[in-house]
């Protein structure tokens, strides 16, 4: 396939350019359908005149339908888009990025979606769609309990969840307590939404994300909390985000003394309440109720979802000690990561 693509790149470069543009249009319609032409043009940075001619072509090929409410993909469009994905990964260099990152971090799999979620918010939805696909593929045997963390990226994963899981007994649980942030970005809310959209089940953990030593000892001694923590820690799959260290510290309203530890330790990334420096070393840990780093080593399928070029350092910090896990990211972050290796 690669040799054919290289031939086309040399002899018919405009063909690949047109194909990429039409692929992106179909991709965005799939994510946001039904969507109007004006919104689509603005989102993709195209003029309405250019988009009008492309939409006319796609309609003539029976790839999209146009309704008063907006454009949607036809069944033919859905099938073509799925078939095009592998080709477009070769054309755009995403496959090479995936291979490079997989080898650099010793991961079991890397999925890179096109675009940069820092620049185009819809890319986060595409990461969400890729994450849902990854979750479904790996829900086998005893791995029917899925623990999920909070954050805007995981909220996008929940948004893209669909009701076609092959295992109706899947149970979604929060990986940890709430952050006290925007309710739709809390782990409890996200796990409930994933369960509802996939027509499966969920259980919630009603405790704050971080506690004093005394409060922590008191809460984890409660029988109901103890049972819930056992269920969470025994989950066969964990889906989590990766945050920028200072952003997460500020969001948690971290005490000044702990904030100094984060700063002095040169932390750049955060996950599960652990703060990591450039070398992937833990420089600070928040006492949280839920999954700890050691829990990830117990034969779990661990899926990290994070993107945006601004998060490259945070992703690198965490993934250096997350061998054999799965990374789902975007082109913006992937290119920054690879650039950092060179």
UniProtKB/Swiss-Prot annotation:
Pfam families for the chain = CggR_N, Sugar-bind
Q: What family classification does the UniProt entry report for this protein?
A: Belongs to the SorC transcriptional regulatory family.
Tell me the function of this protein: In the absence of glucose, represses the transcription of the gapA operon, which encodes five key glycolytic enzymes.
Matching InterPro entries: CggR_N, NagB/RpiA_transferase-like, SorC_transcr_regulators, Sugar-bd_dom_put, WH-like_DNA-bd_sf, WH_DNA-bd_sf
* Molecular function as annotated in GO: carbohydrate binding; DNA binding
The family database entries (PANTHER family) matched by this protein are listed as: CENTRAL GLYCOLYTIC GENES REGULATOR, TRANSCRIPTIONAL REGULATOR-RELATED
User: Keywords on this record?
Assistant: DNA-binding, Repressor, Transcription, Transcription regulation
Reply yes or no: does the keyword Nucleotide-binding apply: no
* Subunit record text: Homotetramer.
In terms of SUPFAM superfamilies, this protein maps to:
NagB/RpiA/CoA transferase-like, Winged helix' DNA-binding domain
**Source organism superkingdom:** Bacteria
DNA-binding region listed in the record: 37-56
The reply on keyword Nucleus is no
Name listed for the protein in its UniProt record:
Central glycolytic genes regulator
């Amino acid at each position: 396939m690669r040799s054919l693509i290289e031939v086309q790149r040399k002899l018919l470069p405009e063909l690949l350019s047109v194909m990429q543009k039409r692929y992106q249009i179909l991709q965005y319609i799939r994510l946001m359908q039904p969507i109007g032409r004006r919104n689509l043009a603005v989102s993709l940075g195209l003029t309405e005149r250019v988009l009008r001619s492309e939409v006319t072509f796609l309609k003539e090929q029976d790839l999209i339908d146009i309704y008063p409410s907006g454009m949607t993909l036809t069944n033919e469009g859905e099938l073509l888009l799925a078939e095009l994905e592998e080709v477009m990964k070769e054309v755009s260099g995403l496959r090479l990025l995936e291979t490079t990152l997989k080898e650099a971090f010793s991961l079991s799999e890397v999925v890179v979606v096109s675009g940069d979620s820092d620049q185009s918010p819809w890319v986060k939805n595409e990461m969400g769609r890729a994450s849902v696909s990854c979750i479904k593929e790996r829900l086998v045997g005893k791995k029917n309990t899925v623990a999920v963390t909070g954050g805007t990226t995981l909220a996008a994963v929940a948004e893209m969840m669909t009701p076609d899981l092959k295992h109706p007994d899947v149970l979604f649980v929060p990986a940890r307590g709430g952050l006290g942030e925007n309710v739709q970005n809390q782990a409890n809310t996200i796990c409930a939404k994933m369960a509802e959209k996939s027509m499966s089940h969920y259980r919630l953990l009603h405790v704050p994300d971080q506690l004093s030593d005394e409060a922590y000892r008191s809460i984890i001694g409660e029988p109901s909390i103890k049972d819930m923590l056992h269920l969470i820690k025994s989950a066969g799959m964990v889906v989590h985000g990766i945050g920028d260290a200072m952003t997460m510290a500020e969001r948690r309203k971290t005490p000044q003394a702990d904030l100094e530890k984060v700063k002095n330790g040169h932390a750049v990334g955060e996950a599960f309440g652990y703060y990591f420096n450039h070398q992937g070393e833990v420089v600070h840990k928040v006492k949280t109720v839920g999954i700890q780093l050691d829990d990830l080593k117990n034969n779990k399928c661990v899926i990290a979802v994070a993107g945006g070029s601004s998060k490259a350092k945070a992703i690198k910090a965490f993934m250096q000690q997350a061998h054999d896990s799965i990374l789902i990211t975007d082109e913006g972050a992937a290119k920054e990561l690879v650039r950092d290796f060179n």
